[in-house]
């Protein structure tokens, strides 16, 4: 017994088995059909109520004019349905050519690899095969020349088409055709049996505008062919698979514009509630646990912070109370007259702290100088070592530089005391600056006139010319004005009390600040006269 008798029947058949069964079924149908069934139209006169529908109803003829119905014999005039389905093609062995899908829209000469054997390298059986040899120089030159000519022709056609005016195309050479007419005889074709016709291309006007519209959109070329699938063809789906792939229609729970009556089971199937089981993700539990832990830690942190704040407040309170107790103790000791050595020790400690602070500032200043930029460092060092003298003259060196302590010589060898220097002790008299300070001519020139050497770099050699330039001089002067006078030298000099204002203020102070001194003296005179009269 064969092994196949024990095995169950296969649920799916291969393509070869399906084709074999189809051939056997067709042979059985030919053998069983004894009489050929052929449909023919009814004879003339018996066609009442008969309407031709199929191609067999027309037989070998055309339409029936007595039947007023749209008829399409041999499908002539019928609108054909547009479809991108390909016709099934078979090879020499009768197998379906599936590579037609990849060859769709491609040229017939294009090589498309769509078989499994295309992936397997071929074995070279004969190394001397001329197809496997490299071309020689002549073949390379010939192919190169053909390629160049084809490219030049394509480029020249595109360039000529883009030109608004172009030269007339060269006419093709004349062609001679031997023509034999169908009507032979003396009365036809002047008795000649054959004629030789010369075909010449019609002359074309180069300035003629185009006759046809060519601005239509050119359809896009075919895309790249799909990747070949190297597996067996698809098998027919079973009924179970078809039911599993059946998708229920989209039924809205809110809108029903057409007013259809939709069964409840279809509505629930479209809703999809019963198709999936409710499954709670475990991340919800993780999130809840994490939130609980975070809340507990936050509460613990808040409580700990509150305890620390309470402890700090308690320490501050205790420190404040201790300070108040010390202050009260010091006040009691001071009131009792008890001297302590704490103040002396505190003073010495404070002095040491000040010395430390000054040294720390000096070290910080030195570090800043070392870190500063070169220009800024030189500027700081220059300002640090700058000498401040009595002569306020920029750019003038100080001739008196000595390390000895200098004193004002005017304070020595004075025969009078303190009351002689300031008007006998009168504070209200303002005579401190009654004499000029360093009234020498050289001193005034140095202070109030810039140095020539310093300003020469800025202004050049024409400094004197600029100083002597008469600026802000009116065109017409007042009468009596003389601008040829010699300019002053030195600082501005003021006259001493030209209006007698100081004298007026002294008189006002002597009268005690009263507004009417005459009125205040009158009652005393009257009172004195009255006393004299009483005595008399």
Curated annotation (Swiss-Prot):
GO cellular component terms, A-Z: cyclin/CDK positive transcription elongation factor complex; nuclear matrix; nuclear speck; nucleus; U2-type catalytic step 2 spliceosome
Compositional bias (Basic and acidic residues): 472-489, 503-530
Modified residues (N-acetylalanine): 2
InterPro entries (UniProt xref): SKI-int_prot_SKIP, SKI-int_prot_SKIP_SNW-dom
Cysteine disulfide partners in this protein: none
One GO term (biological process): positive regulation of vitamin D receptor signaling pathway
One Pfam family in the UniProt entry: SKIP_SNW
Keyword Nucleus included in the entry's annotation: yes
Keywords of the record: Acetylation, Isopeptide bond, mRNA processing, mRNA splicing, Nucleus, Phosphoprotein, Spliceosome, Transcription, Transcription regulation, Ubl conjugation
Region (SNW): 174-339
Region spans: Interaction with PPIL1: 59-79
Cellular compartments annotated: Nucleus
Stretches for region Disordered: 1-46, 209-233, 311-386, 472-536
List of residues that carry Phosphoserine: 14, 182, 190, 224, 232, 234, 479, 481
Principal location: nucleus
Gene Ontology molecular function terms on file: enzyme binding; Notch binding; nuclear androgen receptor binding; nuclear receptor binding; nuclear retinoic acid receptor binding; nuclear vitamin D receptor binding; SMAD binding; transcription coactivator activity
Family: Belongs to the SNW family.
Protein name in the entry: SNW domain-containing protein 1
